[in-house]
Amino acid sequence: MRTSQYLLTTTRETPADAEIISHQLMLRGSFIRRLAAGLYTWLPLGLRVLRKVENIIREEMDKAGAQEVLMPAVQPAELWRETGRWEQYGPELLRFTDRHQRFFCFGPTHEEVITDLIRREIRSYKQLPANFYQIQLKFRDEIRPRFGVMRSREFLMKDAYSFHPDQTSLAQTYNQMYETYSRIFDRIGLTFRAVQADTGAIGGKTSHEFHVLAASGEDAIAFSDKSTYAANVELAAALPPTDKPASPKETLSLIETPGQCTIKEISQFLNIPSSRCIKTLLVQGSEGELVALALRGDHELNAVKAQKLPQVANPLQFATPEQVWKTCNASIGSIGPMGLAIPLIADHGAVQLTDFACGANMEGKHFTGVNWGRDLPEPSTADIRNVVDGDPSPDGEGTLSIARGIEVGHIFQLGEKYSQAMNATVLDETGRAISLAMGCYGIGVSRVVAAAIEQNHDEHGIIWPASIAPFQLALVPINAHKSARVKEMSDRLYTELQAAGFEVLLDDRQLRPGVIFADMDLIGIPYRLVISERGLENNTVEYKRRQDGKTCAIQLDNFISGLKAELKAPISRR
């Protein structure tokens, strides 16, 4: 492809509304253009990347025995009412009526549609297991679409659904999809972690997320430095301390703390570390009354863990300021675990403390020198906090590190949730009707593109992994419009490279070399070949590798073989 015939409109300025680097570079590099909030047109350069991601996914899914289908994006409300999700889904589900006043939605996911298909097509256990996938546009009416294609309203997704006669068969396909996803992200060239995850609204009991590691990631993941253990922070278990609590040394004291409301303010005011403070949170209980949760001041409440406690309402709801005052006779900044007439659950780390500080349930006052068992009863305990760097790994091997991740894939063992709701059954070997066990497996295809940029860029632009780069090679003739020899050689090499199977972008624009070089760095083409009068005098072409900046001269004699040798050379990251 020649740039003079290509839609390539790069910019030097960073768009004001582009918050993260992938959004900035995709706009500046002419990969996407915004149509409306959360809606983007993929330009030719971006579409080449998107299609390469698609092709890798398709090849690996086909290799795993999955069958490709294409289901309607528009779905009738009747199917969603069968599972109850028409009522359960919020405003992110785009609903509308046709001319006959029948309700439909633009599908954000396809569990209902595929289950309806399978209950009509598959009758016997002999047809199982079966795994079907599609690569299709979805729509979720995000309240605040942001970050470009990272969190858009319309997005491209690979979603797969497997059906099984029993849980054993489901587990086998689930493990196969886990390995397939690992191969997909390896082939794309991403550094990622597969982590245990919460099943959320989709349901089921077992789930893993696949996260691309990047500083801009919205999710926190925990992984061991000595084993393969990895989990979303919301699921990573914080093990109880093994040391015995220290013996109390202080006496209970009531301290005036006017205007000191946060843990940071209290610890500074009392001149003690936040790890020796207790923070108390009031939440709605499952039986209607409030429940108090106590944590160390330097720890964060884990909502997923808390709402799984039988005493706590699910989803987690914090008490209102009015409820807090009515229960504790104090505002939120002055409440504590002492003297409460409601159930109290303390995190394992909080129970380990001695001589700690906490709110006194009196406005503007705190206790110091507080000890469990002496000044207040020993509480019920549970793991209700987020893990932190340095915590012991739950598998007993090594310690945990916390990193930011971008979720690009999610797999679930759904069990019989949808098949029972929609009466999807088959006959087993005895002729008895059984509900199908089901798995679902998603990859955010357009999100993978953005995540790859978040992980692979520098101050000059994108550094695409070679497997998904829009072109393999950028061919840059210097002043070809002034030099017949340079133009002739660039045209010849362009033809030879294409014939040899290379994907080549020939930049034949009449621009200054510095501008062209900057554009090629911006759009991230892995390898650059520069043809100049000086090089031709030496019968060479300059070769530069985008990833590590390595440059060398390649002889025009046996040019293709010399280039292939350079492409196979090891890369040292900067």
Swiss-Prot record:
Protein EC: 6.1.1.15
Swiss-Prot/TrEMBL catalytic activity: tRNA(Pro) + L-proline + ATP = L-prolyl-tRNA(Pro) + AMP + diphosphate
Keywords associated with the record: Aminoacyl-tRNA synthetase, ATP-binding, Cytoplasm, Ligase, Nucleotide-binding, Protein biosynthesis
One GO-annotated biological process of the protein: prolyl-tRNA aminoacylation
GO molecular function, one term: ATP binding
Main location: cytoplasm
SUPFAM superfamilies membership: Class II aaRS ABD-related, Class II aaRS and biotin synthetases, YbaK/ProRS associated domain
Source superkingdom: Bacteria
Assigned GO CC terms: cytosol
Keyword Manganese appears in the UniProt entry: no
Listed InterPro entries: aa-tRNA-synt_IIb, aa-tRNA-synth_II, aa-tRNA-synth_II/BPL/LPL, Anticodon-bd, Anticodon-bd_dom_sf, Pro-tRNA-ligase_IIa, Pro-tRNA-synth_IIa_bac-type, Pro-tRNA-Synthase_IIa_type1
Protein's cellular compartments: Cytoplasm
Function comment: Catalyzes the attachment of proline to tRNA(Pro) in a two-step reaction: proline is first activated by ATP to form Pro-AMP and then transferred to the acceptor end of tRNA(Pro). As ProRS can inadvertently accommodate and process non-cognate amino acids such as alanine and cysteine, to avoid such errors it has two additional distinct editing activities against alanine. One activity is designated as 'pretransfer' editing and involves the tRNA(Pro)-independent hydrolysis of activated Ala-AMP.
Domain note: Consists of three domains: the N-terminal catalytic domain, the editing domain and the C-terminal anticodon-binding domain.
Family assignment from sequence similarity: Belongs to the class-II aminoacyl-tRNA synthetase family. ProS type 1 subfamily.
Subunit structure: Homodimer.
HAMAP family the UniProt entry points to: Pro_tRNA_synth_type1
Protein name: Proline--tRNA ligase
Gene name of the encoded protein: proS
